[in-house]
């Protein structure tokens, strides 16, 4: 089974949508662009967001098992994926790639 690296490549905040629809919250996502995590054995890396893991885990598991080429050639690197978390107010984009 391969290790899989998860890199935070973009973090966005839709303040206009938050102002209209979201109740105020004290703690928001603390991931930062450039943060890297390594999944070993297709398991959630320590310190990685639980909600984001729910979004990326199927891709991580597939890459860890040697798969890839998602959606018939979607990515330039067939052993990678670009996946975002499902927070509509503060989406975070992750580049996921198998590593040797």
Where do the model's predicted regions map?
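Short, flexible N-terminal segments of the mature chain
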Residues: 19-44
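Beta-strand elements of well-folded, non-transmembrane domains
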Residues: 10-12, 100
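Short, compact, well-ordered microdomains
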Residues: 58-100
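Short, structured beta-strand/loop micro-motifs enriched in basic residues and often containing a Trp
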Residues: 2, 13-23
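Ser/Thr- (and often Asn-) enriched beta-sheet segments in non-cytosolic proteins
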Residues: 3-7, 36-38, 93-98
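Short loop/turn segments at secondary-structure transitions that flank enzyme active sites
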Residues: 12-14, 43-45
